[in-house]
Amino acid sequence: MEKTLSIIKPDAVKKGVIGQILTRFESNGLRIAATKKIQLSEKEAQEFYAVHKDRPFFKDLVEFMISGPVVVSVLEGKNAVLKNRELMGATNPKEAAAGTIRADFADSIDANAVHGSDSLENAKIEIEFFFSKTEIL
């Protein structure tokens, strides 16, 4: 079974829609193998998003991701990476299909409610960033 990482970002946590988002995953065949609510440090956010360090939005992204708690989860299921990305919708909520997480809960391209791994390779790296093997059941 494939695994992927999901992050419910500070904007969605603040809105109180954690349960609704996790329910969407489960309703669509993704099992929650691990989940925890954490407060990222600036260093952790910089490390996690290091791939974007030379992009103009990097500083704002880091500041946003440390602005409040996040919920990190390992989702497991058939085609988990693709299924999660379909459930999330387009990065820009204005372009996200109706019924997707971002269309329903995101405010902007920056405060876009959720993060999801974009490949199996990145999913493995991202999961290992947040979870030890003993935390994934």
Swiss-Prot record:
Cell compartment(s), UniProt: Cytoplasm
Enzyme class at the top of the EC tree: transferase
InterPro entries recorded: NDK-like_dom, NDK-like_dom_sf, Nucleoside_diP_kinase, Nucleoside_diP_kinase_AS
Entry keyword annotation includes Transferase: yes
GO cellular component annotations of the record: cytoplasm
Active site, renumbered: 115
EC nos: 2.7.4.6
Subunit text: Homotetramer.
NCBIfam families attached to this UniProt entry: PRK00668.1
Name of the protein: Nucleoside diphosphate kinase
UniProt organism field: Campylobacter lari (strain RM2100 / D67 / ATCC BAA-1060)
Source taxonomy: Bacteria, Pseudomonadati, Campylobacterota, Epsilonproteobacteria, Campylobacterales
Name of the coding gene: ndk
